[in-house]
Amino acid sequence: MATQKARNMAIKENDMRAPLKEYEAVQEAAMKFVKSVAEGNSKYARELFIDEAVLFGYLDNKLEHGSIEQFYHNVDTVPGGDHFKARVDVIALEETLAVVRVLEEGWGNRIDFTDYLLLLKMNDEWKCVAKAYNQNSNTIQR
């Protein structure tokens, strides 16, 4: 019993939860994504995503996958809309890895999304390497 307790304490001491300031830094980075979508301008997202970033998801039942350039095209051609809203949640954060969920409502005054962004800390800066998303089924245009 004492041995198990000692093991549990050792695990707890080695648990590498990131400091709160890192959560704030990740959220601030993810807000570049939100700002681009809201304004219909990929400029801010281009600061967040690395050139090799990939995306996967369905837009109006059509699979989009590959280069993040497709996302930039979508953002630059469809404004966020008057009723666009978003929420950013940091789901997981380790020393150099973060998973962020972005809930979007009313993109282009029509579509609701749930996005997951995978970020890596590179050269002391949080950068997005992948984006996967789900379009809420009640907003699919058929």
Where are these regions (language model features)?
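Surface-exposed, charged secondary-structure patches
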Residues: 21-25, 54-60, 65-112
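Short beta-strand edge/turn micro-motifs at domain boundaries
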Residues: 112-142
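Short, low-complexity N-terminal intrinsically disordered segments enriched in polar/charged residues
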Residues: 2-43, 47-51, 139-141
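Residue-level detector of alpha-helical recognition elements and their boundaries
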Residues: 41, 48, 59-61, 115, ...
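Generic alpha-helical hydrophobic packing signal
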Residues: 23-26, 32-33, 96-98, 118, ...
